[in-house]
Amino acid sequence: MPSQRKSPDQKRPRRSLSTSKTAKSQCHSITSYFNSAPPAKLACSTCHKMVPRYDLIRHLDESCANNGVGDDVQVEPAQAGLMSPTVPTSDLPSGPLENVTPQKLSPPKRSLISVQCGSKLGIQQQTSPYFKDALVSKDQNELPNQSVEIMPLGSLTSKLSRRYLNAKKSLAKNEGLASQCPQTSPSTPGTSLTDNCPEMEDKDEVLNSSQKENIYSCAPLKEENASEQKVKNNKITGDESQKASCGEPALTPASAEHASILLSSDSTLVSNTKSSPGDTLVKQESARRADVGLAEPLEVRSHKEVQMTFDAAAKTLVSGEAESNGPTDVDMSDMTTWSNNQELVREAGSVLHCPLEQGSSCGGPSETAQLALSHPYYLRSFLVVLQALLGNEEDMKLFDEQEKAIITRFYQLSASGQKLYVRLFQRKLTWIKMSKLEYEEIASDLTPVVEELKDSGFLQTESELQELSDVLELLSAPELKALAKTFHLVSPGGQKQQLVDAFHKLAKQRSVCTWGKTQPGIRAVILKRAKDLAGRSLRVCKGPRAVFARILLLFSLTDSMEDEEAACGGQGQLSTVLLVNLGRMEFPQYTICRKTQIFRDREDLIRYAAAAHMLSDISAAMASGNWEDAKELARSAKRDWEQLKSHPSLRYHEALPPFLRCFTVGWIYTRISSRAVEVLERLHMYEEAVKELENLLSQKIYCPDSRGRWWDRLALNLHQHLKRLEEAIRCIREGLADPHVRTGHRLSLYQRAVRLRESPSCRKYKHLFSRLPEVAVGDVKHVTITGRLCPQHGMGKSVFVMESGDGANPTTVLCSVEELALGYYRQSGFDQGIHGEGSTFSTLCGLLLWDIIFMDGIPDVFRNAYQASPLDLLTDSFFASREQALEARLQLIHSAPAESLRAWVGEAWQAQQGRVASLVSWDRFTSLQQAQDLVSCLGGPVLSGVCRRLAADFRHCRGGLPDLVVWNSQSHHCKLVEVKGPSDRLSCKQMIWLYELQKLGADVEVCHVVAVGAKSKGLG
């Protein structure tokens, strides 16, 4: 276009906008309205300089003399009046906003702060520098001198949205507590910081009505009884009933208010689940100091229990609350209370300290706060992980001095060096061309940063690239083709892998000129020319990378229980920290109690990390269909495991509870062997698969929850593939006698035994079926409907054609078999329906049992600040450790009327909405009203029965629940439906759940969908 080819100075002037008679008489086409060229330069709204139109944003971010005013808004205490004793408390909003639902994705609103707080609290309104009228000046010399903060270009709106939060943190931490609380001194241990800051609580409630626990708040502690209750709720005082919280006797829900509810028949099930501002203050400070390294190193006592020791500031903080109960000693030997919300890691970057020598990029506390705020999200997350390790003495013992020196060198890197290393660390461990590195937010020229990382031992450059396979992988396909032409390779136009194979074949050939011993070989010539073609390249050094990978593995240890990919070193945990940092993820509030040491020494952790990486490689090979590679990896892992079976550390692992034993090397190698069975079956190597299964079943220490699947696969291989009928029958008998064989696998073994017993070929083995335990499952109601099947090619779920809309405007839509069934039941009078399978019931169970799931007093089930469930949720110890509380709650649910069920679900929903929990899917229901309608239709007996089965054996019972839940909102009639499409049948777990639900009194049925042709709709 002409506007693009001409410079702004050469463009024609703006057309006249005059509405004179002459102009009106002219008739123009519509294109004339788009020919007015914009001005070449615009006046900056801040400094009033004439700036090129295309450089206005860059000028505002980098060059404008007054942009510091908008970036870093300094609110003086005298101006704000937040903590001034002259401000009357009657003008402040009073009362906690307890009924406000926390919003997971809602950041603090600037308009709310400006309107509500500016008038009452005297806070200067935070206005973007682009719209500050106070800065308008016609004389450039009149502009005040402002400090200019150089910020990397990025999302401008994201920078603006964080400015008020950063200014507020700076006020609260650096100015507010020091200037407005002068009475507090180390000589007065009975006075806390909160006694002199009564206004902060009301200020906090106004600023963060929906997530008030996320901001540092100071609640007044004038009433002795109130402060005592708050301290007891947070387990801070030395109360005798709470000192054994990590021992066996004390079992309390996460809130003290729940303790009296468990054994009472009161209609209030979950009362005041959200912590008060005073509670949150102590919880949040505990978590912040533990998570980012402000606390002193953790001490491991003789009973191997982790103790959190607060620094002087923290002791002053809790001294006023502890005074009401007696002496000022605060017993934190049993547990440390963590408030897991998104603000903790968000504030972590501003309080990170570098406990290292001079020369580090983090100079001191004041410099650290300013520097960390400028760090990008990925570096802040990485530093949070490092500080969590440095603050835990038990974890620090798992690294030797050389590895600690690597951490020290990382802190000594410049800010750009740290950023680049974290970026490269998160990428795949392979060689990277320097020309492919583009991180403008780090530096426009990365060469000095790369040299710094190389000198510090974190990077390798092309001088150390000596493997031909690595350099060939580094080249692109066109570069490989060009290189192939120079060596006259046949078919240089092939695929990249074919060219790589051709080069490897050429490199193995012997040189024709055998008399020249000093002449380089063919491999060396290929390597040199390939490196010249690739140019400068680099790779992260394996040694330091392995150290940081182990740190991440320790930090994300609890995630690897279900997430197969978490075995790759905890890379995904950085994403979790990032989401928490951005306020997009919030975890429940629970108490961390680390009593048992999992890894005895450094070598134990290294062995576990090696096994975890092997499991990750095997899983990746299986996912890509490389079964031969997976088989070789599994055989290599088996050899390593055979050498470790006599190691003395295994005896220590055997004594661990199952929910901690899963973090041992033996457990990982057992999972690898279980994967090897699937690989061998895929390759039709059934003899080897049977031997592997027999080895797995010969031990009962590792992976006991998988024994049902192992017995089932062994019986299938012996019966179907190897035709060893007698061995198959004996296998079934032993499997049915195994107490670890549960639910679906138990029924599957029994059904196979029945088929074998009725088979004519097994008549001579009838004596083996004597005393076979019977597994009885009753049948339920079945209905059949028809649906027009949409023609499709390939495998996959069936797609049906369904009529939608009213009679006047009918439409044809494509739907799944479950959606087709929902339409059928909608026509049958059920106006509400959900296709959620097990998530529907687990969400209701999680809401009704929330405080018991996250209750205090059970050691080692919560070990870090990023857990969505206790570690023992998938084991039998979950119900056993909480039996008294669960039995009382289940009886309460069983006899509760519909109004109480609705109220309990509503209270838990409003108090916990958005927090990440394994059982709860917040998007399963369209609203709280829909969830309340469903619980009132299901009733107490059905809900208590479902909750009991899920709590007793969540691992084996979470699957198999009905697909649909439909109900009539007027008659409160509810139906649970399992939908089966063409050529689909019920699984064993589904049969058991339907039978159990029917026994509980629920209306259940199986809806079979029979397909008919769709040619009448013209879709053939």
From Swiss-Prot:
Belongs to the FAN1 family. A zinc finger (UBZ4-type) spans 41-69. It catalyses: Hydrolytically removes 5'-nucleotides successively from the 3'-hydroxy termini of 3'-hydroxy-terminated oligonucleotides. A motif (KEN box) lies at residues 212-214. This is Fanconi-associated nuclease 1. Keywords: Coiled coil, DNA damage, DNA repair, Endonuclease, Exonuclease, Hydrolase, Magnesium, Manganese, Metal-binding, Nuclease, Nucleus, Ubl conjugation, Zinc, Zinc-finger. Its main location: nucleus. One of its GO terms (biological process) is double-strand break repair via homologous recombination. Residues 898-1010 form the VRR-NUC domain. Binds 2 magnesium or manganese ions per subunit. A motif (D-box) lies at residues 14-22. Residues 1-11, 224-242 have a biased composition (Basic and acidic residues). GO terms for cellular component: cilium; cytosol; intercellular bridge; nucleoplasm; nucleus. The UBZ4-type zinc finger specifically binds monoubiquitinated FANCD2. The keyword Secreted does not apply. It is found in: Nucleus. Residues 1-24, 173-208, 224-252, 269-288 are annotated as: Disordered. It holds the Pfam family FAN1_TPR. GO terms for molecular function: 5'-3' exonuclease activity; 5'-flap endonuclease activity; flap-structured DNA binding; phosphodiesterase I activity; ubiquitin-modified protein reader activity; zinc ion binding. Zn(2+) binds at C44, C47, H59, C64. The gene is Fan1.
